[in-house]
Amino acid sequence: MELNKIYHMDAFEGLKNIPAASVDMVLTDPPYGTTENKWDMPIDLEALWKELKRITKSNAPILMFSQMPFTAVAVMSNPKMFRYEWIAEKGNATGFLNANRMPLKAHENILVFYKKLPTYNPQMEKGSRTLEAKVEAREIMAIFAL
């Protein structure tokens, strides 16, 4: 397959054309199977993992967008390689048709899988909400420490 070229084809057929251990990172947003739309049919995760394991280098991260309940299915499809998740805040919430029955969905999960630890360059901001939350968590834990 030619580098930096977009191919319109079945994903599994395309994956077969990628050489083994040649991919530095995978970023995928597979169908979640949470709607009745034709394009949202679940894919064979076992077959996907077989190809992703074959084409990725040993330290290549595999980042997979997901949303519950697909998140649970995706994690359990490869618990050995699952490491952690990131939360991506959406600019616009979805799920307005069900707004009378449940909260709108304002985030997606990004699941992080890998075989060996990839290069990670932390991005930190002083005073970010995440940092503040960690401080609060430490303070709460200190209250319960006997």
Residue ranges with predicted function:
Residues E2-L146:
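Core catalytic lobe of class I
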